[in-house]
Amino acid sequence: MAETKPEIEMSEEERKIVKISSLKKKAINASNRFKNSFKKKGRRSSSRVMSVPIEDDIDAEDLQALDAFRQALILDELLPSKLDDLHMMLRFLRARKFDIEKAKQMWSDMIQWRKDFGADTIIEDFDFEEIDEVMKHYPQGYHGVDKEGRPVYIERLGQIDANKLLQVTTMDRYVKYHVKEFEKTFKVKFPSCSVAANKHIDQSTTILDVQGVGLKNFSKSARELLQRLCKIDNENYPETLNRMFIINAGSGFRLLWSTVKSFLDPKTTAKIHVLGNKYHSKLLEVIDASELPEFFGGACTCEDKGGCMRSDKGPWNDPEVLKIAINREAKCSPISEDEHKHVDQGRSTSGFESLERIKKKTDEDNVYEKQIATIDKSMDMAWLAKTQKAENFPISKGLECYVRKGAPKKGDGLLVGGVMAFVMGIVAMVRLSKDVPRKLTEAALYGNSVCYEESTKSKQNQGQFAAPVSSSEYMLMVKRMAELEDKCMFLDLKPAHVESEKEEKLQAALNRVQVLEQELTETKKALEEALVSQKEILAYIEKKKKKKKLFFGF
């Protein structure tokens, strides 16, 4: 019996060692697959359109963070093959400022939400039949691309009628429609824009038209809908906003914005440009006139498609571009383990270029290969003994993917839904503060710039900004606004006239006040007359005293 106990303890220890070894093996395999993430299966196609080089903007620092994040997800079994996308993981890292633990928690919550909501199959399963009626009460959608190839998203907030919107559909159905459109954007629109622009695109440019926005657009139902959309966007589709233009902003809006922006993250405010009614030149600097609707100062009308807001204009409508975009082989995604072994065993197989041909590449390609080899070496310090040298990365004949050296990082920011909810809140507060002095408004308008500084200047002044508004404070503000609205609605429901008895009492009280005021005036007048008489008597007495002194003095 004395010998069996140590044997049992030893077997438990061995099980722990085996478990740790298996986890470490997974991490090693993940690192190896990550290094080959820019390899693709070869394809045999004679189409000239299929050969499209797409430039990638992931730099060396991001690659190292991605490697660590990807290994952490694999060790926790949080990386299904359909979500094994480097750019998607990078967006979650940026949303949590490259904090791997926070990003992993956000990623885990996103996976659970997709299972519960059914986001993976919502494009096929959900049919939004009432879209025509919905667009009448909530005009929004994509129209064209900006000069850098990003899709342009437009919302005309002043034309939103939440009450009529919820008469033609339900809030749950509209939320499903919103998620479906987001899924289509990532599966169709962004890939199509990437093919058309020859570079990876996963962000959009947004235009919010706030002309005519008031309290009617910010009802209780509208706030509830926007809060749900904001929550979904921020938690499951982070970092999709590149820049936002808020146009037709009135003086009160800009005055309040100049105050509110000091409480926001500088990276967020750098993305938001608040413009008045002279916004056309600013939009045309970013968006070509042929891609901008006529009602925004552009040249596009989309008459044959029912107007710009219904046309869904963009490169995703080009059959050739769409064919490449929806083809999984046209994406830069990590290859499977079997493919990795196949590449290692036979580099000269169909679909891959031979090593001799790689060595004859241009000097620019050699720079990229050296950079990737350097990154591989830094990421494999833990297993340096097992790795002799970094592998060469063959480039596919079709859709070429490489890392651009020194690519700029994108800043953190809010999503369209979140910013839209915040904008609606600001507009509501502006409408409630109409008695702000005009001189104060003019001082804010002519003392500050309407279009705010770019990210380079905001970074220099980061120390001057206060801490951003937390979500709890924002929700508290929204709650108080809801309570205020309920009180206003309660007062509106009361009858405008007062009961006759109360009115008579009130009138009698007013008459009594008038009588008292009249009596007070008369009393005041009598008192003044008495004071005058008293002064005359005192003066007469003084005069008599002086005469008496003179008489006895002689």
Swiss-Prot record:
InterPro entries named in the record: CRAL-TRIO_dom, CRAL-TRIO_dom_sf, CRAL/TRIO_N_dom, CRAL/TRIO_N_dom_sf, PI/PC_transfer
GO CC term, one of those recorded: Golgi membrane
Gene null: resulting phenotype: Exhibits short branched root hairs.
The keyword Disulfide bond appears for this protein: no
Taxonomic superkingdom: Eukaryota
PROSITE patterns: CRAL_TRIO (PS50191)
Residue runs in coiled coils: 498-539
Biological-process GO terms, alphabetical: cell tip growth; protein transport; root epidermal cell differentiation; root hair cell tip growth; root hair elongation
Its job: Required for transport of secretory proteins from the Golgi complex. Catalyzes the transfer of phosphatidylinositol and phosphatidylcholine between membranes in vitro. Plays a role in root hair tip elongation as a key regulator of polarized membrane trafficking. May promote the PtdIns(4,5)P2 synthesis and organization in root hair membrane.
The name this protein goes by in its record: Phosphatidylinositol/phosphatidylcholine transfer protein SFH1
Organism field: Arabidopsis thaliana
Lineage: Eukaryota, Viridiplantae, Streptophyta, Embryophyta, Tracheophyta
Chain's gene name: SFH1
